[in-house]
Amino acid sequence: DKNAFEWTTLNLNANMKDLDGSEKMYLELKGLGAFAQFKLKDGGIVESEYDSVNKVWTIKDIAYDKINDIQFTNDKDTTVDIKAWTTDGIDSTREKPATGFMEVDFAKNAVENGKFTLGKEVNIDFSKIVNGDIQGVNKIDLSAEGENKLLNLTLEDVLSIGTKDVKGNINLTILGDSDDKVTFKNEIGKEWSSNVVNDDKGNKLYTEWSNTTGDTTVTVKVEQPISDGITN
């Protein structure tokens, strides 16, 4: 069984079998979060766009013979409502799309007991998502095999996903190895500062990134040797 934020194949319901085989296919997926990602099984790029108002993903320009090769990630169990249509550049079946659904039932959700775990070769670019889908996090684990990236992490992102301690501050720890990467993004008046610290037992080194807003101090400890720094 797959866990949340691991690559999972998009299985289309059987009542979508009558699609006519035109050159390109489009999908609308409702039920996946803003953190969802898409790719083909062979690593090919899937062009996708998220409508944050209607909470719908649109997947574009998929070759008909690749429709069953689409993989996705999501943070938790859900039902995905699917609409599919074809276009050859002139004619389109969008007005009468095929419809279906997929039940997504993960063995483990992405966030459990405050720990947010990413699967193999899953990346999150915070500049491309809407805050609010992931909450209550105090630890992010990037240690799955392969490269995992957290990109463009702002103060607002950490405020959104983190949980406050009794003093009203947020402490987040990011675990991983040399294959992984974390980048922070400065904003006017909200710049990150960093220094190197040990854990409580003196066994591990971390780069500790700090930022402040009002009475809240945000601290993000990134395990070395994760590659980390400020986005240009």
What are these regions (language model features)?
Residues 115, 136-139, 173:
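Discrete beta-strand positions within long extracellular beta-solenoid architectures
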